[in-house]
Curated annotation (Swiss-Prot):
SUPFAM superfamilies: Tetrahydrobiopterin biosynthesis enzymes-like. Belongs to the GTP cyclohydrolase I family. QueF type 2 subfamily. This is NADPH-dependent 7-cyano-7-deazaguanine reductase. Homodimer. Keywords: Cytoplasm, NADP, Oxidoreductase, Queuosine biosynthesis. The active site is at residues 177, 184. It comes from Xanthomonas oryzae pv. oryzae (strain KACC10331 / KXO85). Pathway: tRNA modification; tRNA-queuosine biosynthesis. It is an enzyme of class 1 (oxidoreductase). It is found in: Cytoplasm.
């Protein structure tokens, strides 16, 4: 079984000179989910949306082509794709000739689906940047914080008040790569219906990820799991928009609804 320590993270590697799908490094989701307490049927649906900013190949005549792309990896794929390996794989296309852009897209779909163990979708282009986004930010709350990890779900409570439907956001989520220790920065959105979540506690909880080491996808699943257990909303959608590294950013979304609530699809200003 592949582990994060087996990947190219934190290692000096040569950039590929030709197309090489073996560069893609899948990491089973099961171990990360077991650490959270997700051992049975998953309480969510969702996807990991990747934005690729550095995609290039050669056309049939050898002329370079450039593009951006949006990739969707389903939440129930047996494996996630380690980000540095995806960067190296996409770079392996740089000197490869294709007859059409569609041939490139099809090749990426096939390779990613094989490694993830589920159908991955790929489309050219990126969502628009939105400087406002959905919801109400909790970042201006006047709170004292001195707990930066590990994540502390005890901060999460729901108020004994009538049910609301609201979207709460924070740009203060930070976690760290579990292999290299590099910081991962994100804006996070919670859309839910239920008793009002106590906002100061939610902010303290999100900040308690600051020294925590876990992959992006696992952080979002941990947030979803903790909020669902501690606050018991009728339904919940959690999405994080991580900042770019190596020409890629990751945007995991988890929802308790079979069809996720209509959060807008956009890129954050920091992306």
């Amino acid at each position: 079984m592949n582990t994060p320590e087996d990947s190219t993270l934190g290692r000096e590697v040569a950039y590929p000179s030709g197309y090489d799908p073996s560069l893609l490094f899948p990491i089973p989701r099961a171990a990360g989910r077991e650490a959270i307490g997700l051992t049975g049927a998953l309480p969510f649906t969702g996807r990991d949306r990747w934005h690729a900013y550095e995609l290039s190949w050669l056309d049939a005549h050898g002329k370079p082509c450039v593009a951006t792309a949006t990739l969707h990896v389903p939440h129930d794929s047996p494996a996630l794709i380690e980000s540095k390996s995806l960067k190296l794989y996409l770079n392996s296309l740089n000197a490869t000739r294709f007859n059409s852009a569609e041939a490139v897209r099809t090749r990426i779909v096939t390779d990613l689906s094989t490694r993830a163990g589920a159908d991955v979708s790929v489309e050219f282009g990126l969502p628009p940047i939105d400087g406002v986004g959905d919801g109400e930010s909790i970042d201006a709350l006047d709170v004292s914080i001195d707990d930066y990890g590990p994540p502390n779900a005890a901060y999460l409570t729901a108020q004994a008040q009538p049910v609301v439907e609201e979207v709460l956001t924070s740009a203060l989520l930070k976690s760290n790569c579990p292999v290299t220790g590099q910081p991962d920065w994100a804006s996070v959105t919670l859309h839910y219906r239920g008793a009002p979540i106590e906002r100061e506690g939610l902010l303290r909880y999100l900040v308690s990820f600051r020294d925590h080491a876990e992959f992006h996808e696992q952080c979002v699943e941990r947030i979803f799991h903790d909020v669902l257990l501690r606050c018991a909303p009728e339904w919940l959608v959690v999405e994080a928009r991580y900042t770019r590294r190596g020409g890629l950013d990751i945007n995991p979304l988890r929802s308790s609804l079979s069809v996720p609530a209509p959060l807008s699809v956009f890129r954050d200003l920091r992306q």
